[in-house]
Amino acid sequence: MAESPSESTSDSLSTTTSTKPAQSGTVSISSPQSHHVVFPEIPIEIVSEEEMAILDAALAASRSILPSVIRSVSPSRITAGGSPKTIRSITLFSKRKLSACSDIEESYLHRFRRNQALGVTDLTGTEWCEKQMENVLCFGRRKVNKAMKVGQARHLQLEEEVVKKVRVKVESNEDKWALKLLNSIAGVNQFLFEGRTRELLLLGFVGGQWIVGIIDELRKAYAEESSDSGPILIDTKTRLRDTLPAEPQRRNGRLQLMLYKLLWDTIVKEGFPTGPFFDYFSLNRNYVLSQDVRDHIANAGIKAQTLEEIVRYYENTFQMLPIANNQLLLKYEFQKDQSIIAEIRFNHDHEWVMSKYREVIEFWRNEREAGYTPEEERWKCRYCQFAKSCPGNPSFESPSTSSPTREAPPLPS
């Protein structure tokens, strides 16, 4: 899609507010399509929660490693036409410090995902190239390019086929989480009654780690395609060219869907650990939700006043569900005319995905150093924004002689 982890499409309940919980804001949430109310079109710049977490963390990291003389430069001086020499010095300094981030002993989980869940796109991005993910965390991701915007717009278009977005004012993190979980509950109910939903947010506890993911599409299996009664998980990826991507990209897509199934099945079979949820995310279980949020919950047909009551609804909703279908579906679509390039069906491989999951978590917990992409896959370096400064790049040259990297998404979505 987009985890991430994410990984990236917008989640079906995308926060568009200030990150300060004390301030009020609005949250966009999805609900099943209604033909009785017409909402005006609002232009939206899609940035998923997982991507915002990466950007926020990268900003914090850059502040922590910049020397005091650079930190003391007034932002107003720079934006108002400050010295080009100062701006160049910051750029050169960031290039020289490309490896400084990994020298800090604190784990990436603690530094960049404190009180946050790891996104599925965090995990798939790490599998793509650990060194690239390390640099993305420490120094930030390049701006969304045209191809990525087209892909994001297509995901939004697909989502709007089955859900509509409404805005609800929020006043705290408890309000935000209540609406996120409510949106998941609504998505599951839509699947149960209509056989299909899109952009379904999942939050679960897998192998000692909180994981969040947004399933692109979820539908009931047709009788002719599977004897398994569980829902089929689907991910649609858009392509600039009407050809299939290389095997490492297809592998990454398969991993993404298997991680969604792992997350779904874990919630269904093992339940939702409510106590650890409130503790890890620093939430007040007895918090009385704001009036606007309570009104929206009531409109959804749920009687709840506190965050804990919504969490219980989320837990009980998934306890009624079957595990996901063992067959998964990865679709590739041509951006130009939205024609289907290929539909790849494959079976879930629990041992393989758990092996990959443990390997990736080791990186996030700093149990080992970040590895470079395998030698046979180092063609990826041609599309990496950090290639000029990365020793793993086969064409690595000194900054004075290297040529610009090619424009392409740094991580698979």
Curated annotation (Swiss-Prot):
Keywords, sorted A to Z: 4Fe-4S, Chloroplast, DNA-binding, Exonuclease, Hydrolase, Iron, Iron-sulfur, Magnesium, Metal-binding, Nuclease, Plastid, Transit peptide
Enzyme class: hydrolase
Gene3D superfamilies: 3.90.320.10
Low complexity compositional bias, start-end: 1-19, 394-406
Organism domain of life: Eukaryota
Compartment(s): Plastid, Chloroplast
Biased composition (Polar residues): 20-32
UniProt cofactor note: Binds 1 [4Fe-4S] cluster.
Subunit structure as annotated in this protein's UniProt entry: Monomer.
Similarity comment: family membership: Belongs to the EXO5 family.
Protein name in the entry: Exonuclease V, chloroplastic
Organism for this UniProt entry: Arabidopsis thaliana
